[in-house]
UniProtKB/Swiss-Prot annotation:
Chief location category: secreted
Keyword terms of this UniProt record: Disulfide bond, Secreted, Signal, Toxin
Changes after translation: Contains 4 disulfide bonds.
Name the UniProt record assigns to this protein: Conotoxin Lt15a
Summary of the tissues where the protein is detected: Expressed by the venom duct.
Family: Belongs to the conotoxin O2 superfamily.
GO molecular function terms listed in the Swiss-Prot or TrEMBL record: ion channel inhibitor activity; toxin activity
Range of residues in the leader sequence: 1-23
Length: 86
């Protein structure tokens, strides 16, 4: 997994360099490429997304931390939403 992350990072940087070289000095393209490369770089090293903790609002079970489920707040109609509960 670590090798894949490094490979993706290198590919992103190489693609950014290629676009910069082919852009003929157009500043808007450079700005977009730098922003995209920085965004991908930070996403790769930020790690996995954090989970939703107990008694916080949710929409799906996958959002909740381990051993928690996204359950209805009010049993009859669920109009008030859902929260992560054990």
């Amino acid at each position: 997994m670590e090798k894949l992350t490094i490979l993706i990072l290198v590919a992103t940087v190489l693609l950014a360099i290629q676009v910069l070289v082919q852009s003929d000095g157009e500043n808007p393209v450079k700005g977009r490429v730098k922003h995209y490369a920085a965004k991908r770089f930070s996403a790769l090293f930020r790690g996995p997304r954090e989970c939703t903790t107990k008694h916080r609002r949710c929409e799906k079970d996958e959002e909740c931390c381990p051993n928690l489920e996204c359950k209805c707040l009010t049993s009859p109609d669920c109009q008030s939403g859902y929260k992560c509960k054990p």
